[in-house]
């Protein structure tokens, strides 16, 4: 995406950029892999698609309406042709001031749009003055005398009438250059005809642009939301002044400061309006973070605790000092957090040891900015987010989309870091905004969504209001299937609640891009086949959508994220995995082993929700591990948190005999870190966690290399053990490290976790229903360790044993024939005698 000339978009950021700093890499933020403008823009509708697809200017311009003759004559005469008597008469009423753009050197030189902040402020003052005059005096009517006087002046001038009108006024759009002398003063001042002013896009300076009715300038299409006729910056002030306030439901309380007006829409276009814009870089930013607690209308008994890695109690910090940025941190209401967590833990159906526990849970941080252009995002904002999280996260992947400007970052980091972010979010947000050279300083008001916490950072900290929004936020219950083969079309089913609302939009993000897809709702009374299975689902309580993605990259593997957005805000996110064909086939078997079958609920949607929750943490960790890291992430490959994640995954796979997936993980480890680097590590003096990591890698390679022998041993173990070992550990139960790898138990995973100091359980990413609890595997589906069964003979001993068994069977058969059928001995011996005599004679 090309940056605007001169880098003007980043100049108003509060002086955070030094003069000697090199030019930012505009096209690379958080490894977005930006190829063109379409990669960052979602399919907003047929209108916007048509704009970008058809560059022909003539097809985009509507037919030009002809101006009325009376108005044309009156406007053509202009104020310059009024006689002194008419000017004296008009002095009694307010006379419109001359547009300052007519004396702007940038504007007269043809640099449109011109970047003059002082001119914009003067134009805004004129607009406010015009509106105030209209409200006080009502609709003004043009005096008849003015028209007659103008006409008389024009007629009286005779041949010299051209001296009172502009010599030549044409539209500024190349290829149009329509005569605008007969149009109203607005169009003459801005040098634009009616067709170009109402066109969806025109070609100006080699770029498709659209005319902004508020600015009087042409902007690039990215500065507009959907089919709006005003740019985002002007639309915020315009809507604050012209729109009526919404109803009491979903708005801020009446005592909120008049400078801002928040609607109930947590993510729609333009719900945050600024009235007073003051972007002087010398002024210290005064902000406030108001408490916004979401009371979501969820199904009865829904478990909000499982929606994100953290859910802390609300904490308020009020500071009215004008020299510092003030905040008040709040957390979304987690109704019955401790009770629900206790109930879930004590449930006989929920066995935490039978599920995968991630050492680095994945969460979501979203920034909603209002005065940013996606093309102007600097690369160093990635480093600023890293510093904000106090420690380098294990994984970080970001996505940008319009709608103001929304930056969504999916972060995987250790549990203790999520706890720290939850306990002290207010101060961390404060440090993010007020950090030296902060790119968010001076950018006005914006939102920050940290998992289920929503922060409103305002520009003026004079008023602090705590508000409780009564909204029904969208909720995704499950996505089926949860993994797809790379390079193949993706067809999935999405089930949720409160999804089909105004401004509905489905989002599928993968590898730094939002994937273009088709989404349609399947009516509740319809019966459809689930993808990948012949199971029929008939659901009348939940909303079901079908998402189809026709193309995907063949050589790109990793996690993808499914979200839904509507007028009530952004839903929870559900991860899916894009991998190789071999990995997808193995995940199907692992899914059956982890979940098995459950008779707890007869509802198909509830049953699929139960099955998916056991796989979410496992899937997203595999996705991060097989994903090719960026250049900035190579320096973090051997960090403590990253090594612990590799150990956690290999330990789980070894304990449960998932050898095929273990082979994929080992190959991915060799490709990412490199076998040469691993061999060099073994020669040096290492820390305990690195030693443990190398021990698991060695054990995993031995198991993969001896897989044929290991598979035969496992088949014998499963057949001989059956149900005769009731005391054997179930699937996923931890066994001592010395038994599985032969290393000392003092280097166990949890003993090396110096940061947290205790076992970390992976909180689920989605907000599950109460019945969405991990189910037991069937008792017959046991994956036993080789150490649990006695040693079985192998190699040469097996061949000798087989030969002995065959010879014994032949001898027994011969003895039975001689004893019980003596008259048959001659019949059976005749062929043998002939065969032996034939061989002897030859």
Swiss-Prot record:
InterPro entries: SBP-like, SBP_dom, SBP_sf
Positions with biased composition (Low complexity): 69-85
Location in the cell: Nucleus
UniProt short sequence motif Bipartite nuclear localization signal, positions renumbered to this chain: 228-244
Positions bound to Zn(2+) 1: 171, 176, 193, 196
Chain positions of all zinc fingers (SBP-type): 168-245
UniProt biased composition (Basic residues): 236-246
Distribution of this protein across tissues and organs: Ubiquitous.
Annotated spans, Disordered: 1-22, 59-97, 140-168, 236-256
Feature: compositional bias, Gly residues: 1-18, 146-162
A molecular-function term among this protein's GO annotations: zinc ion binding
UniProt keyword terms in alphabetical order: DNA-binding, Metal-binding, Nucleus, Transcription, Transcription regulation, Zinc, Zinc-finger
Binding-site list for Zn(2+) 2: 212, 215, 219, 231
Cellular component per GO, a single term: nucleus
UniProt comment concerning the protein's domains: The SBP-type zinc finger is required for the binding to DNA.
Function: Trans-acting factor that binds specifically to the consensus nucleotide sequence 5'-TNCGTACAA-3'.
Name by which UniProt lists this protein: Squamosa promoter-binding-like protein 9
Organism this protein belongs to: Oryza sativa subsp. japonica
Lineage, top ranks: Eukaryota, Viridiplantae, Streptophyta, Embryophyta, Tracheophyta
């Amino acid at each position: 995406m090309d940056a605007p000339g001169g880098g003007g978009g980043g100049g108003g950021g509060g002086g955070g950029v030094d003069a000697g700093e090199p030019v930012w890499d505009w096209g690379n933020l958080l490894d977005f892999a930006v190829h063109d403008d379409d990669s960052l823009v979602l399919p907003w509708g047929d209108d916007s698609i048509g704009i970008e697809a058809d560059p022909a200017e003539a097809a985009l311009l509507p037919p030009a309406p002809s101006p009325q003759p009376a108005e044309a004559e009156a406007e053509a005469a202009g104020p310059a042709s009024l006689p002194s008597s008419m000017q004296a008469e008009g002095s009694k009423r307010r006379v419109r001031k001359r547009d300052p753009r007519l004396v702007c050197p940038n504007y007269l030189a043809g640099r449109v749009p011109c970047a003059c902040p002082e001119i914009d402020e003067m134009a805004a003052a004129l607009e406010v003055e015009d509106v105030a005059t209209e409200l006080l005096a009502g609709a003004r009517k043009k005096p008849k005398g003015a028209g007659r006087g103008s006409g008389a002046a024009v007629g009286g001038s005779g041949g010299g009438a051209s001296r009172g009108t502009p010599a030549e006024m044409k539209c500024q759009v190349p290829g149009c250059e329509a005569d605008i002398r007969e149009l109203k003063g607005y169009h003459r001042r801005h040098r634009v005809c009616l067709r170009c002013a109402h066109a969806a896009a025109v070609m100006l300076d080699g770029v498709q642009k659209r005319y902004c009715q508020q600015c009087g300038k042409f902007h690039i299409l990215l500065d507009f939301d959907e089919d709006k006729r005003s740019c985002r910056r002007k639309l915020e002030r315009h809507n604050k002044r012209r729109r009526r306030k919404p109803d009491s439901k979903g708005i801020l309380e009446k005592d909120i400061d008049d400078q801002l007006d928040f609607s109930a829409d947590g993510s729609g276009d333009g719900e945050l309006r600024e009235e007073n814009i003051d972007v002087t870089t010398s002024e210290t930013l005064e902000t406030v973070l108001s408490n916004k607690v979401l009371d979501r209308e969820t199904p009865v008994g829904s478990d909000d605790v499982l929606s994100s890695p953290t859910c802390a109690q609300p904490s308020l910090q009020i500071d009215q000092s004008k020299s510092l940025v003030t905040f008040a941190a709040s957390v979304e209401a987690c109704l019955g957090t401790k009770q629900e967590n206790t109930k879930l833990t004590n449930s006989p159906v929920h066995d935490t040891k039978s599920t995968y526990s991630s050492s680095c849970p994945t969460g979501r941080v979203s920034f909603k900015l209002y005065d940013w252009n996606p093309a102007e995002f600097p690369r160093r904002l990635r480093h600023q987010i890293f510093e904000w999280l106090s420690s380098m996260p294990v994984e970080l992947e970001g996505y940008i989309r319009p709608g103001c400007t929304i930056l969504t970052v999916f972060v995987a980091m250790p549990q203790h870091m999520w706890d720290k972010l939850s306990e002290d979010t207010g101060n961390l947000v404060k440090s993010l905004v007020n950090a030296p050279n902060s790119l968010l300083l001076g950018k006005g008001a914006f939102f920050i969504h940290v998992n289920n916490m929503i922060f409103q950072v305002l520009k003026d900290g004079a008023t602090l209001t705590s508000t409780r929004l009564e909204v029904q936020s969208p909720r995704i219950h499950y996505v089926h299937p949860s993994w797809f083969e790379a390079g193949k079309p993706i067809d999935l089913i999405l089930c949720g609640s409160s999804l089909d609302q105004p401004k509905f939009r489905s989002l599928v993000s993968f590898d730094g891009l939002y994937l273009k897809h088709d989404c349609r709702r399947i009516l509740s009374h319809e019966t459809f086949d689930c993808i990948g299975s012949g199971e029929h689902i008939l659901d009348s309580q939940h909303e079901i959508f079908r998402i189809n993605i026709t193309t995907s990259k063949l050589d790109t593997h990793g996690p993808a994220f499914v979200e839904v957005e509507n007028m009530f805000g952004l839903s929870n996110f559900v991860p899916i995995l894009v991998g190789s064909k071999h990995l997808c086939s193995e995940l199907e078997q692992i899914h059956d082993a982890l979940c098995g079958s459950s008779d707890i609920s007869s509802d198909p949607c509830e049953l699929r929700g139960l099955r998916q929750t056991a796989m979410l943490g496992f899937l997203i960790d595999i996705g991060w591990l097989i994903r090719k890291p960026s250049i900035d992430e190579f320096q973090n490959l051997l960090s403590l948190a990253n090594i612990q994640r590799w150990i956690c995954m290999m330990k789980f796979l070894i304990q449960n005999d998932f050898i095929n997936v273990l082979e994929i993980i080992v190959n991915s480890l060799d490709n990412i870190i490199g076998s040469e680097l691993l061999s060099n590590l073994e020669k040096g003096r290492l820390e305990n966690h690195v030693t443990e990591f190398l021990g698991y890698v060695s054990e995993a390679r031995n198991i993969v290399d001896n897989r044929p022998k290991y598979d035969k041993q496992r088949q014998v173990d499963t057949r001989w053990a059956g149900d005769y070992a009731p005391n054997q550990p179930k699937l996923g139960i931890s066994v001592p490290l010395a038994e599985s790898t032969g290393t000392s138990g003092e280097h166990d995973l949890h003993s090396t976790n110096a940061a947290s100091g205790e076992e970390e359980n992976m909180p689920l990413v989605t907000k599950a229903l109460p019945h969405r609890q991990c189910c037991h595997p069937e008792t017959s589906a046991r994956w036993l360790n080789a150490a649990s069964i006695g040693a079985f003979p192998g190699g040469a001993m097996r061949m000798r044993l087989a030969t002995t068994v065959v010879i014994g069977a032949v001898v027994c058969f011969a003895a039975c024939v001689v004893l019980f059928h003596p008259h048959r001995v001659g019949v059976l011996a005749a062929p043998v005698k002939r065969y032996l005599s034939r061989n002897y004679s030859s």
